Design a protein with these regions (language model features):
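Phosphate/ribose-recognition catalytic cores of enzymes acting on nucleotide-derived substrates
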Residues: 227-284
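Nucleotidyltransferase catalytic core that binds NTPs
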Residues: 2-237, 250, 280
Length: 284
């Protein structure tokens, strides 16, 4: 496996892969790799000749007073995880490599899709995501790019960007990977105290109860949202940011009844750590 920390070097590697007609899979990450990331890398390795994993804590997607400085940076371990999962290249640029100028070009998806859910409290977040991912698409010339469904809003925003800007890349959205006790894998789980970690299990439990209610015929949006909120609030240290439902694709409003394919998403704080999770409710 090659560790590449230079834009020019990555371009040279990619040009050679393309000359050899090799298909390229891209797995964009912010590092602190865990089994969720490994599953994305593994999927890419199975479906492509070459897998490039980017490791970059992207400053432009963090707002003021968010956890940019505290975000775990573990490049040495990330390389081990990536290699074991089947990566061929780890691309770990510095900030100045991807953002060489103070005055810069932004790639921004507008409309409600970036204003609801996480966009409501993190207004600059998705602009940072789409800007850095568009740079990574251009540099990697990837045929396929791999993202986890845990960041469901992000995947919808990126789908819009790919469609609108005619990126010649296939988005592969992979299932949420969970701990044995149900907690969704996240690099931010490392921030949780033992008490917070135990309380955070209420997230997957609340979504499981919602899925059961839906499976048993409940289609009333308010009833399911209240079920999830009440379940989460049974954990005293939980602070709900949002529990909401939107139609898929495109995150459109749902109305009073669940019809078609719907995203039930939540964001909840335990102490200072904000966790997200979701489930898709769909009539089969």
């Amino acid at each position: 496996m090659i560790l590449c920390q230079d834009v020019a070097k990555l371009r040279e590697l990619v040009a050679n892969f393309k000359k050899e007609n090799k298909s390229i899979g891209l797995v964009p990450t912010m590092g602190a790799l865990h089994e969720g990331h490994a599953s994305l890398i593994n999927a890419s390795a199975k479906e492509n000749d070459i897998t490039i994993v980017s490791v970059f804590v992207n400053p432009t997607q963090f707002g003021p007073n968010e956890d940019y400085e505290a975000y775990p940076r573990t490049l040495e371990n990330d390389c081990i995880v990536a290699q074991n999962a089947g990566a061929d290249v780890v691309f770990a640029p510095k900030n100045k490599d991807l953002y060489p100028n103070e005055d810069m070009t932004w790639v921004e998806v507008t409309g409600d899709i970036t204003k609801v859910l996480c966009g409501r409290t993190r207004p600059i977040h998705f602009r940072g995501v789409t800007t850095v991912v568009s740079k990574l698409f251009n540099l990697s010339r990837a045929d396929r790019a791999y993202f986890g469904l845990k960041d469901a809003q992000q995947t919808e925003v990126l789908r819009r960007m790919v469609d609108d800007l005619f990126f010649n890349v296939e988005l592969r959205i992979m299932p949420i990977v969970r701990e044995a006790d149900g907690l969704a894998k996240s690099s931010r789980n490392t921030y949780l105290s033992p008490e917070e970690r135990k309380s955070a299990l209420i997230l997957s439990k609340s979504l499981r109860l919602a899925k059961e209610a839906f499976t048993n015929g409940q289609r009333d949006v308010e009833a399911i949202l209240n079920l999830v909120k009440d379940t989460i609030q049974s954990e005293k240290i939980s602070q709900i940011d949002y529990v909401e439902m939107y139609k898929l694709p495109g995150l459109k409003p749902v109305g009073n009844k669940i019809e078609g394919r719907v995203l039930l998403a939540l964001a909840v704080k335990f102490g200072t750590t904000r966790l997200i999770d979701n489930v898709i409710l769909e009539d089969k």
